[in-house]
Amino acid sequence: MTWFGVWDPVWVGLVGLLFGSFLNVVIYRLPKMMEAQWDRDCAEHLGQTPATQAPTFNLMVPRSRCQACGHTLSWYENIPVLSYVALRGRCKACKTAISPRYPLIEIATAGLFALCAQRWGISFSTLAWCGFAATLLALAMIDWDTTLLPDDLTLPLLWAGLIAAAAGWTQVDLRTALWGAVAGYLSLWLIYWGFKLLTGKEGMGYGDFKLYAALGAWFGWPALLPIILISSVIGAVIGIALKFSSGLREGGYIPFGPFLAGAGFAAMIWGPDRLQAVLLGWIGGRSEERFSRNAETD
């Protein structure tokens, strides 16, 4: 590896900091944009006309501002991580505390981008996986905050996985990716309807189907079982912890998207083959242990 190549993760990680700053905007604004669109659609359906034109609100406009006092942030207050440290985690104008989640998301994005560069170097594969990581992180945070998995993110993630597979930028071929997308969607769809018929309740949303299909497109159908098992175990552990700490939301609902995303990150970092090997080893070990106990009993 050349001297420049050794520093690839650093340069790409710095780019990740910038993307992380933008992800904070996406995570906060996209759900609000969706709600505003739903309100407009409902008003149009009812034949209502808004009294005033709503101000422009999208991912670019208006500029970022303090949610407490409305202070518009200058460019030097928007520098990833450094601005938070320099301002000591408080708004420059009103001194209201700024959530540490903002720099943490920036750091997480930088770390994921650096891992991609470390693994694939400066290549189209790194570009593809950085896009995957950023989108998955945004989806996880939005779902945790709002229980929404926007089609504006899940569907592009799915199609990007198929395109990346066709271009040879992932570890799976297009056929395996296609089957992964189809199997991912249908499997959760069947579980959803089975649960609803048995209990009369909805155990998950359609966004979960699309996210699982997207993971199938990126990792192929063989990775679907390890991904769903890992996400289910993590979700169960966190759910139990929240229940005992009285941290569950009203109705006891926990969004499943963040746990699917966590399993997706694990598959990206360690590779789907290693996840499958760990799963098979665990199942094999449990079966062998059970067989030994039965033999001793006999």
Describe every region a protein language model picked out.
Residues 2-29, 33, 190-202, 213-287:
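Alpha-helical transmembrane segments
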Residues 12, 125-234, 276-285:
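Functional transmembrane core segments of multi-pass inner-membrane proteins
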Residues 29-101, 256:
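Membrane-proximal soluble regions of multi-pass membrane proteins
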Residues 79, 92-102, 141-155, 194-207, ...:
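Interhelical loop and helix-boundary elements at the membrane-water interface
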Residues 288-294:
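Conserved small/polar residues in nucleotide/adenosyl-binding loops
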